[in-house]
Amino acid sequence: MTVDDDIEWRVTPGLSPYAETVAEMEARAAAIRAGEARELIWLLEHPPLYTAGTSAEADELLLPDRFPVFRSGRGGRYTYHGPGQRVGYVLLDLDRRGRDVRCFVAAIENWVIATLGDFGIAGRSEPGRVGIWTGHGPDEAKIGAIGVRVRRWVSFHGFSLNVDPDLSHFSGIVPCGLGEFAVTSMARLGIPAEMAAVDAALRRHFPAMLAGLRCSTRSDKDS
């Protein structure tokens, strides 16, 4: 048995409506907490929309009528979801895997970075800036976003990775409150990857992500 044999992997084809998806995700998180459902990694795409995290500021929504806007219970600020972007919802029981939210976020970052590495893309994290970054100097850009919530030590929401979305759609917001940085994608970097190949890489690196949840220091943060 591998470390993730008891975790369900779900890949939903097409475009998943946001409100219905979040409702199902929250119900699943509650069921995991109650011991009534398996943990879940849920990979999907959404139709074009903006979501506002708990730290979002009103002036960061530049074009409020462009796409539907949803208030989200995740951490972070405004982000865009749409076709060509792989969204991963990560529903794990951190009560059994390590009660450390910072460690959890870092593990997701490292997971996405390792996935990008399979395609020859050097991703990295940056101190003080949650997310995944590529390039340096004038070429520095964000390729992946992370926004999570933890309730009673069960995580939900997760990450997004720009495979080949319409990057012009990000112009309706200040992405993650960082207006001075560009947004990029695998396709923009010259890597026209199929979504199935990205999913396979995520699955390949998932055991290391789980192992990364056990940090040497533990968080006392209430959830």
Curated annotation (Swiss-Prot):
The gene is lipB. Belongs to the LipB family. Catalyzes the transfer of endogenously produced octanoic acid from octanoyl-acyl-carrier-protein onto the lipoyl domains of lipoate-dependent enzymes. Lipoyl-ACP can also act as a substrate although octanoyl-ACP is likely to be the physiological substrate. NCBIfam families: lipB, PRK14341.1. SUPFAM superfamilies: Class II aaRS and biotin synthetases (SSF55681). Residues 35-214 form the BPL/LPL catalytic domain. In the reaction, the free carboxyl group of octanoic acid is attached via an amide linkage to the epsilon-amino group of a specific lysine residue of lipoyl domains of lipoate-dependent enzymes. Transmembrane segments: none annotated. It comes from Rhizorhabdus wittichii (strain DSM 6014 / CCUG 31198 / JCM 15750 / NBRC 105917 / EY 4224 / RW1). Pathway: Protein modification; protein lipoylation via endogenous pathway; protein N(6)-(lipoyl)lysine from octanoyl-[acyl-carrier-protein]: step 1/2. This is Octanoyltransferase. Its main location: cytoplasm. GO terms for biological process: protein modification process. Substrate binds at residues 74-81, 145-147, 158-160. The keyword Cytoplasm applies. Gene3D superfamilies: Bira Bifunctional Protein, Domain 2. The record marks 142 as: Lowers pKa of active site Cys. It catalyses: octanoyl-[ACP] + L-lysyl-[protein] = N(6)-octanoyl-L-lysyl-[protein] + holo-[ACP] + H(+). The active site is at 176 (acyl-thioester intermediate). It is an enzyme of class 2 (transferase). Keywords: Acyltransferase, Cytoplasm, Transferase. One of its GO terms (molecular function) is lipoyl(octanoyl) transferase activity. Signal peptide: none annotated. Its EC number is 2.3.1.181. It is found in: Cytoplasm. GO terms for cellular component: cytoplasm.
